Amino acid sequence: MRILVTGGAGYIGSHTARLFAEYGHEAVVYDNLSRGHRWAVRWGPLVVGDLADGELLRKTLRERRIEAVVHFAAVALVAESMKAPELYFRNNTMGSLTLLESMRAEGVETIVFSSTCATYGHPVRLPLDEDHPQAPVSPYG
């Protein structure tokens, strides 16, 4: 299977790409390298691009014949999100929307989205589960 790993030059994304390669899949990494590292991409091709670039996303999905997407690309620091909420909205929210629109345009129907416990905010009860209320307390969440 050919899988696009957004944010694949980061810690979690690069390890995921390695596992895909070990299991015989082709992991195509899509990363803008703003926080990831070129040296971390060792188990498949790297496409340097931003989530905001719908044209490059569509071209990558089409030309690489991508069958599924694992989406890790995000800026992910709570304190920074409080100081620069527009960066988090632009990259995490609008970038994800551009990715989804590009997938739809190219007929790619499968996505795994890596989220965060920051979406829950302050816990109402413990342990947290998927039915817990979503009440983020930061732009990142």
What name fits each language-model region?
Residues M1-G141:
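N-terminal Rossmann-like NAD(P)+-binding domain of SDR-like oxidoreductases, especially those catalyzing
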